[in-house]
Regions:
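Sec-dependent signal peptide recognition
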Residues: 2-10
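Solvent-exposed, polar/charged alpha-helical surfaces in well-ordered, non-transmembrane soluble domains
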Residues: 30, 34, 38, 58-62, ...
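C-terminal motif of bacterial Sec signal peptides marking the signal peptidase cleavage site
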Residues: 15-16
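Catalytic cysteine-centered active-site loop
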Residues: 42-92
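Aromatic- and glycine-rich peptidoglycan recognition patches
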Residues: 19-24, 28, 34, 69, ...
Length: 153
C-alpha cells in the first residue's frame, strides 16, 4: 500500500511540475506577463536586456521573445507595431506608451498585467526604481500616458 501511494505521489508531482513550468500551455498574453514578472526587482540599465540590468524596451522584447513573438527593441519602433486601441480595452500583454519628457516623442513603455479600479496596471523598467508594477491611476503615469497598442490578438 505504501509503495503504491509513493508511486502515485511521484507521478502526480512529475506531471504537475511540468504543467506549472510549461509556457506552451499558457495563452501568449499570459506568457508575456509571466516572463515579464520574472524581472521584478531587476535594476534599470539603459540598453540592458538581462537580470543584471534592463530598460523598458528590453523587458518587452525579452518577455515577448520567450513566447516566440518577435518585436522591436526600441520604444520608437515598438510604437509602430500592432494595433492602437483605447486604454479601457487594454488586456494583459498589451503595451502602454508614455511621453516622459517635454518632447512629443514617446520615451517609455510597459506591459499591461491587469486592471485595477478601471485603469490598467503595468510592469515596466523605471529608471529610478528598476522593474516594478505601476498603475495609470498614479498621477505621473496618468499625465505621461500617450497610447495603448495590442500586439497579440
Amino acid at each position: 500500500m505504501r509503495k503504491s501511494f509513493g508511486f502515485i505521489a511521484l507521478v502526480f508531482l512529475a506531471t504537475s511540475c511540468g504543467m506549472l513550468k510549461g509556457s506552451k500551455k499558457m495563452k501568449p498574453r499570459d506568457g508575456v506577463v509571466f516572463y515579464a514578472k520574472e524581472y521584478l526587482g531587476t535594476p534599470y540599465r539603459l540598453g540592458g536586456n538581462n537580470h543584471s540590468g534592463i530598460d523598458c524596451s528590453g523587458l518587452i522584447h525579452n518577455a515577448y521573445k520567450k513566447q516566440g513573438i518577435s518585436v522591436s527593441r526600441t520604444v520608437n519602433l515598438l510604437r509602430k507595431e500592432g494595433k492602437r486601441i483605447s486604454k479601457d480595452r487594454a488586456k494583459p500583454g498589451d503595451l502602454l506608451f508614455f511621453r516622459t519628457t517635454k518632447k512629443r516623442k514617446l520615451t517609455h513603455a510597459g506591459i499591461v498585467v491587469g486592471q485595477k479600479g478601471g485603469e490598467p496596471i503595468f510592469i515596466h523598467a523605471s529608471s529610478s526604481r528598476g522593474v516594478i508594477i505601476s498603475s495609470l491611476r498614479e498621477g505621473y503615469w496618468n499625465k505621461a500616458y500617450a497610447q495603448t497598442r495590442r500586439l497579440i490578438r
